[in-house]
């Protein structure tokens, strides 16, 4: 059966260094004793359940006794209930190193939650403040059908209460102990869900580092929920980790040897051990004597039963490769033929790169609403435009966008349905939008901030203007009309992606260099999109790479205006475009919607870059509005 000795020692051993430094335990015991131990575990669990049922029956009989004692006892029980926030604490689910996990009942909805109670004094004495902080930070943003959800954190002077998703199916460890080795289809289903959750973590720069069946919970439908992110760590490009984390039986060779490792490869190794346990009911590397266990892990040699299919054996050997450079990646696992069989669509929703290039303004607003951040929309924009993909605001934004894409785990939705988002309170007023410049145009842009909390350097910069056209048509229809208008105006353009182009007027002379303008499509809310007009004059005047600059633009609320013009038979019906001009602070551009392209300046004098930018915008808007 499934023997797992690290369950009792994983809290005592944080690893690190060579295995010979650890305290040796007794030599390996015969397999018969393991079976006795597993049977004893089952019997003890059964006896505990019987005692619990008996106590419950006794309590019920007392409550049903005649007389007025029933209501009195009920009132006493209600008074004795412990309430934290909107949650009433019930029975204890388990006891850990830092505190207890109790069942909580939301007093309004009566939904069950799991309340993890962390004692502040224990946290400080054990020097695990960073561990707890990492778990809270990661779980508060993770929204995946197979990762445990953290709803709320309540702090008191003595304790920290983590209000988490309640799952009633117990640990995957107990499930394996009860059922032994699983059928291939069931093992594959569990494994697919685990890999989906791990891939989600890695894509958002988090490694778990303690994956094992005890940290994999099951809900009432036997769906996996990854829990316990206390040992997780944020990945940073170029950085390596040395900390020995996790349980010895599931730890990769480089971890127990104290070598440097990047992060994702250790999770892949742990997933390989879990897959072996699911299919075989035992562990690939197991020994009561810790130094012997470490020698087995470092050798990478494990038994492969005859009942395992050849594709499974190949996958296991690829995942449990001692050399981390040759070890399978998560992408390799997902692409494997055995893994792909009966793979549900929702686990890995396809990401359309063109759709991904459209910035979700609702997601930006949601990031600003996190009380822990206290940031303005411009700061989120700056993080998205910056060179650091691991910025905490960028990670938060991407997590929110991913949450909108991932469907419920029991539904099988089409690709289009993955992008249907239901706003909480309907579409709100249009705020200023973030600007996203492709890497080929600008490596980093430092925006001008209007809020008083901005840095001194940014406070001295002039306020930004924004210019755009808002439409409820499909993105491809909007861009079709944009390209049609640019062609009609005889402009030149360069396509960065289907929703981002650089445009300019055709030069009057070979030596002329007309100012360029960026057209970028953004998603405003569920039903509408914003076509942003942005001047690139400052970037041109700075340097070829255009690392950062101020820019001229302006914001435009819109008046409906129908679009006329021929359309090919392959395109849908004409869209309804909105365009109008907001109140200006400096100039009155009420005549910008003219139908003709403005004539060149008299005398050949050059117009200012800003005025030329406005004239190009006016020409495009006028053409689109016809």
From Swiss-Prot:
Disruption phenotype: Shortened life-span. Temperature-dependent hypersensitivity to stress, slow body bending, abnormal modulation of head oscillation. Reduced survival following oxidative stress induced by the superoxide paraquat. Reduced survival as a result of hyperosmotic stress induced by NaCl. Double knockout with aak-1 results in reduced glycogen accumulation.
Keywords (A to Z) from UniProt: ATP-binding, Kinase, Nucleotide-binding, Phosphoprotein, Serine/threonine-protein kinase, Stress response, Transferase
UniProt modification remark: Phosphorylated on Thr-243 in response to oxidative stress and during dauer development. Phosphorylation at Thr-243 is increased in response to sodium azide or the AMP analog AICAR (5-amino-1-(5-phospho-beta-D-ribosyl)imidazole-4-carboxamide).
Chain intervals for the UniProt region annotation (Disordered): 1-77, 541-568
Residues at which ATP binds: 93-101, 116
GO biological process: cellular response to glucose starvation; determination of adult lifespan; negative regulation of protein secretion; negative regulation of TORC1 signaling; nematode pharyngeal pumping; positive regulation of autophagy; positive regulation of dauer larval development; positive regulation of protein secretion
UniProt biased composition (Basic residues): 38-49
Residue ranges with Low complexity bias: 542-555
Basic and acidic residues: compositionally biased ranges: 1-24
Chain positions found as Phosphothreonine: 243
Subunit (UniProt): Tetramer, composed of 2 regulatory (R) and 2 catalytic (C) subunits. In the presence of cAMP it dissociates into 2 active monomeric C subunits and an R dimer that binds four cAMP molecules.
Cited function: Acts as a sensor that couples lifespan to information about energy levels and insulin-like signals. Role in motility and response to oxidative stress. Involved in the establishment of germline stem cell (GSC) quiescence during dauer development. Plays a role in axon regrowth after axotomy in PLM neurons. Plays a role in the maintenance of glycogen stores which are necessary for resistance to hyperosmotic stress. Plays a role in the regulation of flp-7 secretion from ASI neurons.
Protein name, UniProt field: 5'-AMP-activated protein kinase catalytic subunit alpha-2
Organism the protein comes from: Caenorhabditis elegans
Species lineage: Eukaryota, Metazoa, Ecdysozoa, Nematoda, Chromadorea
């Amino acid at each position: 059966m499934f023997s797992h000795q690290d369950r009792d020692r994983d809290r005592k051993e944080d690893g690190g260094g060579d295995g010979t430094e650890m305290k040796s335990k007794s030599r390996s015991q015969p397999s018969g004793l393991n079976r006795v131990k597993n049977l004893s575990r089952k019997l003890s669990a059964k006896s505990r359940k019987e005692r619990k049922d008996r106590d419950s029956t006794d309590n019920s009989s007392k409550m049903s006794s005649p007389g007025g004692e029933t209501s009195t006892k009920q009132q006493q029980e209600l008074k004795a209930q412990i309430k934290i926030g909107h949650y009433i604490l019930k029975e204890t689910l388990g006891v850990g190193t830092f505190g207890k996990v109790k069942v909580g009942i939301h007093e309004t909805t009566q939904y069950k939650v799991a309340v993890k109670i962390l004692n502040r004094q224990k946290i400080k004495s054990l020097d695990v403040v960073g561990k707890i902080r990492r778990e809270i930070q990661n779980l508060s943003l993770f929204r995946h059908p197979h990762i445990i959800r953290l709803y709320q954190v309540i702090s008191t002077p003595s304790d920290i209460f983590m209000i988490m998703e309640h799952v009633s199916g117990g640990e995957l460890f107990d499930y394996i102990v009860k059922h032994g080795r699983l059928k291939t289809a069931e093992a594959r289903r569990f494994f697919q869900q685990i890999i989906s959750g791990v891939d989600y973590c890695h894509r958002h720069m988090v490694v778990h580092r303690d994956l094992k069946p005890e940290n994999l919970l099951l809900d009432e439908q036997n769906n996996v929920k990854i829990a316990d992110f206390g040992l997780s760590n944020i990945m940073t490009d170029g950085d390596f980790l040395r900390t020995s984390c996790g349980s010895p039986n599931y730890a990769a060779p480089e971890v127990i040897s104290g070598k440097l490792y990047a992060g994702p490869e250790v999770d892949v190794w742990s997933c390989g051990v879990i897959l072996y346990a699911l299919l075989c009911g035992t562990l690939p590397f197991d020994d009561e004597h810790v130094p012997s266990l470490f020698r087995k892990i470092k050798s990478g040699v494990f038994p492969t039963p005859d009942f395992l299919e050849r594709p499974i054996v190949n996958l296991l050997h690829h995942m449990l490769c001692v050399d981390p450079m040759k070890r399978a990646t998560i992408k390799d696992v997902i692409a494997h033929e055995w893994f792909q069989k009966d793979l549900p669509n929702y686990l890995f929703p396809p990401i359309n790169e063109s759709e991904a290039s459209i910035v979700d303004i609702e997601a930006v607003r949601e990031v600003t609403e996190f009380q822990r951040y206290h940031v303005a929309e411009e700061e989120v924009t700056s993080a998205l435009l910056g060179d650091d993909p691991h910025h905490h605001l960028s990670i938060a934004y991407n997590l929110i966008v991913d949450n909108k894409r991932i469907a419920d785990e029991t539904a099988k939705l089409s690709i289009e349905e993955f992008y249907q988002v239901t706003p909480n309170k309907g579409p709100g007023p249009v705020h200023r939008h973030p600007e996203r410049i492709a890497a080929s145009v600008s490596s980093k842009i430092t925006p001008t901030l209007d809020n008083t909390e901005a840095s001194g350097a940014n406070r001295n910069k002039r306020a930004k203007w924004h210019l755009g056209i808002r439409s409820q048509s499909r993105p491809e229809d909007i861009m079709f009309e944009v390209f049609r208008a640019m062609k009609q105006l005889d402009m030149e353009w360069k396509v960065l992606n289907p929703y981002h182009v650089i445009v300019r007027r055709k030069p009057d002379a070979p030596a002329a260099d007309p100012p360029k303008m960026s057209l970028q499509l953004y998603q405003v809310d569920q039903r509408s999109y914003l076509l942003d007009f942005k001047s690139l004059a400052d970037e041109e005047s700075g340097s070829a790479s255009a690392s950062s600059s101020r820019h001229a633009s302006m914001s435009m609320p819109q008046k409906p205006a129908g679009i006329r013009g021929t359309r090919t038979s392959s395109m849908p019906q004409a869209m309804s475009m909105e365009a109008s001009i907001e109140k200006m602070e400096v100039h009155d551009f009420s005549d910008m919607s003219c139908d003709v392209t403005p004539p060149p300046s008299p005398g050949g004098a050059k117009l200012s870059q800003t005025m030329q930018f406005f004239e190009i915008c006016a020409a495009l808007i006028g053409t689109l509005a016809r």
